[in-house]
């Protein structure tokens, strides 16, 4: 799939902007604070309906403006579509081909986007929360109903937590919440397990290629409830419910839910050693690259087209060897790259690169390479 054009009105520091894109490499160049990341943020919004930088939509509305508009035309399965977002200070509207959507879930999976930022390079060494976010975001693109399950699970988890914080705990109400957590938690677990199996196979081969066969990458799903790979969804539900029940006295004492899929993690190993504890920074970064490239391949396998890739200030964090490792595996992917250095174009075949020079919320010049 390819993003063909982008239109912004009152988005961040852009009063009005219309861009036509290269189907291969789009290099957004400018000094810090000029608006490079704002453009890729708006592209991300077209895919997920929310920002990767803030949870507050109103922060994206240009100063002294009431509403913002983001419109993106893209091709998928040889068909053109238009996604539009209109965000005001108290409202948000999303349309696909002029048809209003009722839920974010309806947007997911239309324009598939993968973002690779400096934070992703720390995926291996960061905490479980970041790795769960990595899993959840990508499954939601492939299986939009997963987002519904996750939303319902988190809502119920918050409700259960409020009950646990009461002086007098309503255990009958906890019974209801425990059943709901086990129901949605079992759906989420099964979908995570299947996703991790698939990406584990891809990433093992990917990492072997990136390291010339020297390192073997393996990833495993870590859960707290002794669920096995063979367990059915009914077995997962029963184990989850039993764990919540047996641990309820501890939850009441600690006033929090200590067990569940909100505590799961992704264990990452290099040559059978925990990469988080024993991997060098270079090994951890190469493992992160392997996981992101595998994410792209998995989406391609599932939806039969490559996603759009955003590389937000990643090259500044990588040495030249790792820059080339990354780029050499992305020849079929449309890329949007933010950089303070125009010299990064030399990594690519220059005829495939369009350079957008950005200054103070405006694209001051465009250098075309390919189509």
Curated annotation (Swiss-Prot):
What keywords would UniProt list here? ATP-binding, Cytoplasm, DNA damage, DNA repair, DNA replication, DNA-binding, Nucleotide-binding, SOS response
Naming one, the record's GO cellular component terms include:
cytoplasm
Q: List the InterPro entries hit by this protein, alphabetically.
A: DNA-binding_RecF, DNA-binding_RecF_CS, P-loop_NTPase, RecF/RecN/SMC_N, RecF_2
User: Where does this protein chiefly localize?
Assistant: cytoplasm
Note the CDD domains from the entry: ABC_RecF (cd03242)
Q: Which domain of life is it from?
A: Bacteria
**Subcellular location per the Swiss-Prot or TrEMBL entry:** Cytoplasm
Please name the GO terms of the biological process aspect recorded for this protein, alphabetically. Answer: DNA replication; DNA synthesis involved in DNA repair; double-strand break repair; SOS response
- Record-annotated residues binding ATP? 30-37
Q: Which GO terms describe its molecular function?
A: ATP binding; single-stranded DNA binding
- The yes or no answer to whether the keyword Cytoplasm is present is yes
Q: What does this protein do?
A: The RecF protein is involved in DNA metabolism; it is required for DNA replication and normal SOS inducibility. RecF binds preferentially to single-stranded, linear DNA. It also seems to bind ATP.
What the entry lists under NCBIfam families is as follows:
recf
Family affiliation: Belongs to the RecF family.
* Listed name of the protein: DNA replication and repair protein RecF
Q: Origin organism of this chain?
A: Clostridioides difficile (strain 630)
Query: Which gene does this sequence derive from?
Result: recF
């Amino acid at each position: 799939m390819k993003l063909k054009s982008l239109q912004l009105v009152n988005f961040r520091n852009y009063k009005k902007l219309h861009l036509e894109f290269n189907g291969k490499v789009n290099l957004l160049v400018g000094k810090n604070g000029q608006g490079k990341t704002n453009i890729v943020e708006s592209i991300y919004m077209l895919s997920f309906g929310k920002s990767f930088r803030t949870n507050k939509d109103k922060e994206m509305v240009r100063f002294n403006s009431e509403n913002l508009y983001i419109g993106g035309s893209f091709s998928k399965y040889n068909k053109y579509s238009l996604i539009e977002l209109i965000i005001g200070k108290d409202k948000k509207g999303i349309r696909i081909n002029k048809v209003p959507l009722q839920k974010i879930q309806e947007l997911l999976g239309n324009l598939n986007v993968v973002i690779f930022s400096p934070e992703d390079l720390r995926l291996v060494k960061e905490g479980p929360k970041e790795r769960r976010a990595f899993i959840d975001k990508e499954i939601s693109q492939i299986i939009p109903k997963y987002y519904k399950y996750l939303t319902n699970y988190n809502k119920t988890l918050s409700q259960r937590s409020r009950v646990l914080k009461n002086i007098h705990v309503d255990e009958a109400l906890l019974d209801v919440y425990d059943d709901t957590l086990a129901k949605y938690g079992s759906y989420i677990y099964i979908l995570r397990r299947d996703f991790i199996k698939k990406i584990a196979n891809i990433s093992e081969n990917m990492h072997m290629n990136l390291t010339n066969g020297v390192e073997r990458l393996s990833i495993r799903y870590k859960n707290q409830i002794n669920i096995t790979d063979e367990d059915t969804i009914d077995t997962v539900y029963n184990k989850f419910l039993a764990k919540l029940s047996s641990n309820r006295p501890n939850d009441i004492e600690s006033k929090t839910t200590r067990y569940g899929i909100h505590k799961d993690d992704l264990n990452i190993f290099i040559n059978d050693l925990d990469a988080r504890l024993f991997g060098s920074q270079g090994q951890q970064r190469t493992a992160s690259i392997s996981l992101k490239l595998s994410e792209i391949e998995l989406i391609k396998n599932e939806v039969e087209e490559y996603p759009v890739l955003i590389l937000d200030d990643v090259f500044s964090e990588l040495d030249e060897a790792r820059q080339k490792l990354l780029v050499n595996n992305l020849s079929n992917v449309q890329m949007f790259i933010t950089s303070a250095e125009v010299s990064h174009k030399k990594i690519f075949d220059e005829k495939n690169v369009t350079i957008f020079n950005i200054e103070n919320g405006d694209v001051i010049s465009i250098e075309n390479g390919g189509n």
